Curated annotation (Swiss-Prot):
SUPFAM superfamilies (alphabetical): Class II aaRS and biotin synthetases, Putative anticodon-binding domain of alanyl-tRNA synthetase (AlaRS), ThrRS/AlaRS common domain, Translation proteins
EC number(s) on file: 6.1.1.7
Superkingdom as given in the UniProt entry: Bacteria
Chief location bin: cytoplasm
Family, per entry: Belongs to the class-II aminoacyl-tRNA synthetase family.
InterPro entries for the chain: aa-tRNA-synth_II/BPL/LPL, Ala-tRNA-lgiase_IIc, Ala-tRNA-ligase_IIc_anticod-bd, Ala-tRNA-synth_IIc_core, Ala-tRNA-synth_IIc_N, Ala-tRNA_ligase, Ala_tRNA_ligase_euk/bac, DHHA1_dom
Keywords, in A-Z order: Aminoacyl-tRNA synthetase, ATP-binding, Cytoplasm, Ligase, Metal-binding, Nucleotide-binding, Protein biosynthesis, RNA-binding, tRNA-binding, Zinc
Cellular compartments per GO CC: cytosol
Source organism per UniProt: Acidiphilium cryptum (strain JF-5)
Co-factor binding comment: Binds 1 zinc ion per subunit.
Name of protein: Alanine--tRNA ligase
């Protein structure tokens, strides 16, 4: 059987032999394309090449592109698992010509590859062409020898491709495979075309027009080719399958799911195994490409995919995290073709496991609430949209999971009601936001940006300059003038002040003119590239058109530069210490500290932190030059620069390099960055890590300081050690041993105290045994005795009595803890649970629990401990 890996290799090798550049798959997160959530087709990474906005050193390309369709126009999520060919993740094989060859070569390449290299029988193939594309029909007849009946003309948009309302467009030609008359379905264009007999395997797009406004089409001067073949669909044909989920890669994941869950891969749980196999691929590749689960944007879509898979794991009977255990099986199948998968495997596993743990709690609660609501419905009645929205909004239960659960019961959902509830909530949120004044202020910045243009930033080369005031904003509105004492927001024509972005805080400083001083307390970026200087006029008055001298706080900027450059060294040191899965997830570069968030599935150990700290300080001591160059994003990435996930880059980027290179790299750290940096690494001075913590699933935070702050942190720790050593009368080096000895001594004393308390409690209780309704009863308020000792004390008292009831109360930590013990011969009339619940009510508790012979409870009101014991006494029956 031809494996999926072999098919991919054969496809790419064929086009490499035919002069194509084999381009690695781009990440699933599109670069500089806000119109797309994820890459959803093979041509997406080449979009700017087709439109002429980007130039590459080749005119022919081939790729196997990772794609995800799980939102927006291309949303296959709801169908995944229930059909033979729907997926959230798939591979798109494609070849592309950027103004080089056109229809004839594209058709010849496709026909040769399919019939010669892959060995498909010619009689099994037929094609469609756009009904006006006589040229393509003629070429298919000449090159492939296809008769007219196997060249089907289609008049719909299915055979005419557009990039958008305007832009490149052109006719398509689709190649179909005929499974034969034993499979139901008709040829494309027929009433039965939705059957499975004729399967589209390859789409050739002939970009030959430019769509202008008003629907005018003009010929492109250099026509191009874009083709796409779904690997999973094509593998099914070559492997003799009628279902993509029966192909080697997906089948291996289905079998792994069945093995771990101890269920039949093809029985009642068939759909669930298919969903898990598909969603495992989408989840793993998205995490490998930098997406982590969250409640917004791409992270939200990822979480939806993950939770749908987890819902099906629940249907398999899995109550513990399970899907994360399938990641190694995926890496074995696809890790060679996509090395980012094994690199990020640890992060994928840990992220999945944490999400599964959290989701298990939410799922049980959500399904229980949903079942309660369904019980209220009549036969065939839809679930009200307001109920579904409450599950979604209040309990975090996704709508698609509600729909999945209802589908199993053959019930519908009131989508209109859900949409209405969602709209009501958004309206409330909009009203609250508009009332805050933020909406009006944002409009001001947009209007000023349209009128004044962007601000020219001079701060890379200077920290002071002359400038003109273009606008004065007071209380969120443009003003003609402002005077001493007023808080203002100013727009200048040019500025040395850095506006907060990329994790670096905004500059502070002064704006001065004769008789005028403005203290700038912050600089922010609005409406894209409008720099807003916030501050207070200390003397004089200002108006638009005035000239000022802008001067940044030099010492503060220097400290910020040091921290920002240190984050670059820290980033690389962490990647080398922990692995290439480490990527930046957030940062703060302030004058007094730095904060750096990374993708990392587990806490960073103390030993690892010390190694990273030593590495960064070694690079600082090198005192290597920090170099900044401007280049295209593609050139930067080729040079080894790290492009940060979520950042938007223009046609030209700043690449910051620092530290001596090794292992074929031109520098130790190479990153795309728009911030300000030191001139040499030695200018950082020193580096000290202060803390490491978790901030979200799969994300760890490093906090550190540089320069004098790093030295101060070291001195403070030294002073603390010396103070502790002096208090314990040992040398600092002997502190660990002395502390260990003290802790052991403390444990010994605690054991002795507990034993003395136990003896006092049991001894005193024995002396105070009373008789109630003919039954021995011992009741004691034990004060500060630990609540965890109450059960053993009650048991000891009961043993000393032989037959009877013991009730004990602890008031440690100003709370009442109660235990009631009843000998077995008395439990039929005196249940310990009933007795302790009565006591709990007295001290403000909400009940209690346990067994008929031993139960415990508690409450916040320790002052009523004796009354609680009296409540037990009052309920004792003979």
């Amino acid at each position: 059987m031809t494996s999926s890996n072999d098919i991919r290799a054969t496809f790419l090798d064929f086009f490499a032999r035919n002069g194509h550049e084999v381009v690695p798959s781009a990440p699933l997160v599109p670069r500089n394309d806000p119109t797309l959530m994820f890459v959803n087709a093979g041509m997406v990474p080449f979009k700017n090449v087709f439109t002429g906005h980007e130039h590459r050193p080749y005119v022919r390309a081939a790729s196997s592109q990772k794609c995800v369709r799980a939102g927006g126009k291309h949303n296959d999520l709801d169908n995944v698992g229930y059909t033979a060919r729907h997926h959230t993740f798939f591979e798109m094989l494609g070849n592309f010509s950027f103004g080089d060859y056109f229809k004839d070569v594209a058709i010849e390449n496709a026909w040769t590859l399919l019939t010669r290299d892959f060995g498909l029988p010619k009689e099994k193939l037929l094609v469609t062409v756009y009904h006006e594309d006589d040229e393509a029909a003629s070429l298919w007849k000449r090159i492939a020898g296809l008769p007219d009946e196997k060249i089907i003309r289609i008049a719909t948009d299915d055979n005419f491709w557009r990039m958008g309302d305007t832009g490149p467009c052109g006719p398509c030609s689709e190649i179909f495979y005929d499974h034969g008359p034993s499979i139901p379905g008709g040829p494309p264009g027929s009433p039965d075309e939705d059957g499975d007999r004729f399967i589209e395997i390859w789409n050739l797009v002939f970009m030959q027009f430019l769509e202008e406004p008003a629907g005018v089409r003009n010929p492109l001067p250099r026509p191009s080719i874009d083709t796409g073949m779904g690997l999973e669909r094509f593998a099914a044909i070559l492997q003799g399958k009628h279902d993509n989920y029966d192909t080697d890669t997906l089948r291996a994941l289905i079998l792994a799911s069945a093995e771990v869950s101890h269920t039949d891969p093809d029985g009642a749980h068939k759909v669930s195994h298919r969903v898990i196999a598909d969603h495992l691929r989408a989840t793993s590749f998205l995490i490998a490409d930098g997406v982590l689960p969250s409640n917004e944007g791409r992270g939200y879509v990822l979480r939806r995919i993950m939770r749908r898979a987890m819902r099906h794991a629940h249907r398999l009977g899995m109550r513990e995290p399970f899907i994360y255990r399938l990641v190694p099986a995926l890496t074995r199948q696809m890790g060679v073709a996509f090395p980012e998968l094994p690199r990020a495997e640890a992060l994928i596993v840990e992220t999945l496991k944490l999400e599964e743990q959290k989701f298990a709690v939410m799922l049980e609660r959500g399904l229980s609430l949903l079942e309660d609501e369904v019980q209220k419905l009549g036969s065939g009645e839809k679930l009200p949209g307001a109920v579904a929205f409450k599950l979604y909004d209040t309990y975090g239960f996704p709508l698609d999971l509600t729909e999945d659960a209802l589908r199993e019961q053959h019930r519908g959902l009131d989508h209109e009601g859900f949409t209405a509830s969602m709209a009501e909530q958004k309206a409330r949120a909009r009203a609250a936001w508009a009332g805050s004044g933020d909406a009006a202020t944002e409009t001001v910045w947009l209007d000023l940006r349209d009128r004044l243009g962007g601000t020219e930033f001079l701060g890379y080369s200077t920290e002071e300059s002359d400038a003109s005031i273009l606008a004065v904003v007071v209380n969120g509105a443009p003003a003609g003038r402002a005077e001493a004492g007023q808080e203002v927001a100013l727009i200048l024509n040019q500025t040395p002040f850095y506006a907060e972005s990329g994790g670096q805080v905004g500059d502070t400083g002064t704006l001065t003119a004769p008789g005028v001083t403005i203290r700038v307390t912050d600089t922010q970026k609005k409406a894209g590239d409008l720099f807003v200087h916030y501050g207070t006029i200390e003397e004089g008055e200002i108006a638009p058109g005035n000239s000022v001298h802008a001067e940044v706080d030099h010492a503060r900027r220097g400290a910020i530069r040091a921290h920002h450059s240190a984050t670059h060294l820290l980033h690389e040191a962490l990647r080398r210490a922990l692995g290439p899965h480490v990527t930046q997830k957030g940062s703060l570069n302030a004058p007094d500290r730095l904060r750096f968030d990374i993708s990392q599935p587990r806490p960073v150990t103390g030993a690892e932190l010390r190694a990273v700290e030593r590495e960064v300080n070694a690079r600082i001591r090198e005192n290597a030059a920090v170099e900044t160059r401007l280049m295209t994003p593609d050139e930067a990435v080729k040079r080894g620069a790290m492009a940060l996930f979520g950042e938007k880059y223009g046609d030209e980027v700043r690449v910051v390099s620092m530290g001596a290179g090794d292992a074929g790299r031109s520098a130790y750290s190479i990153e795309l960055c728009g911030g300000t940096h030191v001139a040499r690494t030695g200018d950082i001075g020193a580096f000290r890590i202060l803390a490491e913590s978790g901030v979200a699933a799969g994300i760890r935070r490093i906090e550190a300081v540089t320069g004098e702050a790093a030295l101060a942190a070291t001195e403070a720790e030294t002073d603390l050690l010396e103070e502790a050593a002096a208090a314990l009368k040992v040398a600092p080096a002997e502190l660990p041993a002395r502390i260990a000895a003290l802790l052991e001594e403390k444990k010994r004393f605690e054991r002795q105290v507990a034993e003395l308390q136990r003896k006092l409690a049991t001894g005193g209780a024995a002396a105070e045994i009373e008789e109630v309704a003919g039954i021995k009863f011992a009741a004691r308020n034990l004060g500060e005795v630990s609540p965890r000792d109450l059960k053993s004390l009650a048991d000891s008292i009961l043993k000393s009595m032989g037959s009877g009831i013991a009730a004990l109360v602890s008031t440690a930590e100003s709370k009442a803890s109660i235990v009631v013990a009843v000998s077995p011969d008395l439990t039929s009339a005196n249940n310990a649970v009933t007795l302790v619940q009565a006591a709990s009510g007295v001290v403000g508790g909400k009940g209690g629990g346990g067994r008929p012979d031993m139960a415990q409870a508690g409450g916040p009101d320790a002052s009523k401990a004796d009354e609680a014991l009296a409540a037990v006494r009052a309920l004792i029956k003979p």
